Amino acid sequence: MHVSMIIFVSIFSIKYIMATKYTMRVLIPKYGKGMKTEYFYNMIKESRPNASPLKITESYGRDAHLNLYALSTSQSLMLTYGKDEFWKIIENKLGNEVNETIDLDDLYPSRYRMRFVFKDLISSDNDLYMDTKFSDKITSTKQQKKWVKESVKKTKNKLEEISHSAKLWNATIYMDILKDDNMELYDDKTVTKIKKQGKVKQLPVYCHMDKSVNQYTNEIVAKRKNPIEIVDKKDVSVAPLRFNAFMATIQQKFVTGNKKDPFWANITEEYLTSVIGESELIFPAKFKVIMELENLTDPDEDKKIESTISNTVYNREEMVNMLDILIQMLIVRLNEESHPGKIWNVKATIVGIREMYDDVKTIKHFLV
């Protein structure tokens, strides 16, 4: 494997670490000879902001009859020190300061969820992702504070089970607040009736009940073409610019956050196989993945997300690995930007550049 590929993979590879599969030994930190944990802890404590403000994403999902707020804050921590105020800081910000940020009295009844992203300050290979389930309906500030306190405690305990106690982490915490006083849970008969009335798009596409989300997913999956079809494929040869390129596009619908949906598995397996099988790619090459997402509930939320331009790959195996990494990066980004249960129509395009003359400047211009 080429050196540039190894470097890229080590930096950008994304791993979801489960407590049942990893031991504390795996996560033992390497600080260097003669370096003590106290040094790093003091460095973290000194650099930690006294007041890390909550960032707010405005409410969205208007046509789905719901309001959803996303708040986030970032801090660093080291598990060794029980006296570390990190968890108290988080509990205070999401349990108390949130009331100063949003008028929660106007949001009750609501449901809450917390998501934690722990970045390893020593090795990005050990990054952790945790989240809570959406809470039961909360109708008061007292209930909200109690739920936050319990959720922070459970997450702390979970992290301590799978992380070495001297591990350095930078944590970003997200709290999603879902106002659901207008949320309705439809049974099958009601759904059928609404569909006959042509009001499918008015159904609330987020729901804390698995059955409702699965219902949408099953209908979408049943209509997909299998194997995945390449709906648009272009080969471009531009002699004056001295490079060749190809673009391959598919189009499918999927539901965010449903683990039973094979959408992403198909993208990373069948899609790549189809593209690679038809492409007469000449190595070395660079790649980029572009996804245009149409929100079937609210057109104002349509979005386009793109991967970075990959490092150069020199053979088929490197190409498969590189494309998989680029797609996984987009999955993480989309999960951060979209709450579970949203229905999207996605147009995914892989762009490949044949670097026959390794004209990097021209390639970047083409991809932007």
UniProtKB/Swiss-Prot annotation:
Keyword annotations from UniProtKB, A to Z: Glycoprotein, Signal
Residues in the signal sequence: 1-19
Residues with attached carbohydrate: 99, 170, 266, 295
Keyword hit for Signal: yes
Name the UniProt record assigns to this protein: Uncharacterized protein ORF83
